[in-house]
Amino acid sequence: MKIDLNTIFPSSRKEYIPGKIYKNIKIGMRKVSFNNDTESIFIYDTGGPHSDQDIQTNINNGIKKLRLNWITDRQDVEYYDRHTINTNSSTAFPLQNNKALKSKSDKPVTQMFYAKNNIITPEMEYVAIRENSLIQKLLSHTPNTIIPEITPELVRQEVAAGRAIIPANINHPESEPMIIGKNFLVKINANIGNSAVSSDINNEVHKMIYAIIYGADTVMDLSTGSHIHNTREWIIRNSPVPIGTVPIYQALNKVNGIVGELDFNIFKETLIEQAEQGVDYFTIHAGVLKKYIQYTTNRLTGIVSRGGAIIAQWCSIHNKENFLYTNFEEICDIMKSYDIAFSLGDGLRPGSIADANDKAQFLELKTLGELTDIAWKHDCQVMIEGPGHVPMHLIKENVEKQIYFCKEAPFYTLGPLTTDIAPGYDHITSAIGAAMIGWYGTSMLCYVTPKEHLGLPNLNDVKNGVITYKIAAHAADLAKGNPSAYIRDYALSHARFNFRWYDQFNLSLDPETAKSFHDESLPSEHAKSAHFCSMCGPKFCSMKLTHQLQLNSTE
């Protein structure tokens, strides 16, 4: 797949900002130059080398191991032989490393451990510079700023307190550090992955690249079809953003989909295999307790989480407690040895408006808070997954309860969808809820594509989902008073009022689409300097009339 960056993001170049504490780190940002060539703004960029016009990437080679020296220079990790996996050699990543890194002893190698010990890591400085997006010179345009300047020390404090996480497995050195927390920019996740109906490794890798070029901050590989292990290896080796998974899917695949044959040893083996590959965060459905399952029987849509349903069925078959819950501390020992973050799964989330905010959902949430405390004692990073399907008037309660039960650990929500009546448009029904819940304090929003509830998303669906959720996240950032969000709106509105059409296109989330819509009715180059568009024409343009009014008032 050939991506033309000059078409997707005209008048943009990747530039690299050096660190101050760590002089050797360089943070990539997208510089958008205005048509007058004298002004520009910097935009947070998630594409890594895939969004740099000067770098030719090849998915067969993977991308640069940006953090490898940072990791090994700490001298608290060592190489060992990776577990041997029986996979189809014809689909294997060609440059697969047979060694993996792990902590040298029982001491954690997590960003939380370093933060608690007053160590500012290169990862922490990196995310601080990314979050600021060079806003200092433009702060005069940001009234009512309520978010402080992001410094490496602030990042350290937030990670140490558990209010933010930096997902960064030591076996994923290709990743560019990013931070998830309510005092930072709202992030978005894009789900990709094959199914039993559709399995194509090349297609999934390109979905990942497409997603991050358009702004996905993390990607989850939710593959349930063929070649799960190899698909994930290809994705990780080519990904500059953190990769998350739901390990229970592959564990179930190992027992041919027979839930009753699952056990903790199979799950543990799967965790370690994925840890060695470099997965940055795991969704673990440890809060689905046996005693909670009874409260889902009267729901309209029952248990809609795949992981939650698997665990519930296992508990029912064996009449035993959830093995993820009973072995949680052993899972923590694995996580802290590789710096894998927990994404504590909401296996009992509501799957319909009728089931929102019910007893099962909030009992599980309370348990997730208890598990968060245990993980923090092991210096593991934690975020909490949330719903789901929730009407607008019930959204705030979700955030309030999550903050209370989970002690401000970052909240990561799927939408929520605010109505169930629009299959084919659930990227919109969910973006309404996503913007609201982001404003209330959710740290990361999991995108929903137009194909939700209908089928596996294709490349265009991925793009639509990412753009829709970038809008929701940005709207939440504006509501929270984030100055870097305000600056982009200010710049685009200024271009719009002054009929600088190309600057208006180029500052938008999707310049290619914005320009194509303008071209449908006014395709000529002359129209790109006209003081009107086809909506109002030259006589009824309110902005043109306002310009004349302002001119008259100065005479």
Swiss-Prot record:
Q: Where does Zn(2+) bind?
A: H389, H453
Q: What is its EC number?
A: 4.1.99.17
Gene Ontology biological process terms in this record: thiamine biosynthetic process; thiamine diphosphate biosynthetic process
Write down the PANTHER family for this protein, in alphabetical order.
PHOSPHOMETHYLPYRIMIDINE SYNTHASE, CHLOROPLASTIC, THIAMINE BIOSYNTHESIS PROTEIN THIC
Subunit structure comment from the entry: Homodimer.
Question: Which family is this protein grouped under?
Answer: Belongs to the ThiC family.
What domain of life does the native source organism fall in? Bacteria
Q: Which keywords does UniProt give here?
A: 4Fe-4S, Iron, Iron-sulfur, Lyase, Metal-binding, S-adenosyl-L-methionine, Thiamine biosynthesis, Zinc
Cofactor binding note = Binds 1 [4Fe-4S] cluster per subunit. The cluster is coordinated with 3 cysteines and an exchangeable S-adenosyl-L-methionine.
Would you tell me the Gene Ontology cellular component terms? cytosol
Q: Name the pathway it acts in.
A: Cofactor biosynthesis; thiamine diphosphate biosynthesis
Cofactor dependence is on: [4Fe-4S] cluster
Its lineage opens with: Bacteria, Pseudomonadati, Pseudomonadota, Alphaproteobacteria, Rickettsiales
Q: Which residues bind substrate?
A: N191, M220, Y249, H285, S305, R306, G307, D346, G347, L348, R349, E385, Y412
- Has the keyword Metal-binding been applied to this entry? yes
- Function text: Catalyzes the synthesis of the hydroxymethylpyrimidine phosphate (HMP-P) moiety of thiamine from aminoimidazole ribotide (AIR) in a radical S-adenosyl-L-methionine (SAM)-dependent reaction.
Q: Name one GO molecular function term.
A: carbon-carbon lyase activity
Give the catalysed reaction(s), semicolon-separated.
5-amino-1-(5-phospho-beta-D-ribosyl)imidazole + S-adenosyl-L-methionine = 4-amino-2-methyl-5-(phosphooxymethyl)pyrimidine + CO + 5'-deoxyadenosine + formate + L-methionine + 3 H(+)
Q: What is this protein called?
A: Phosphomethylpyrimidine synthase
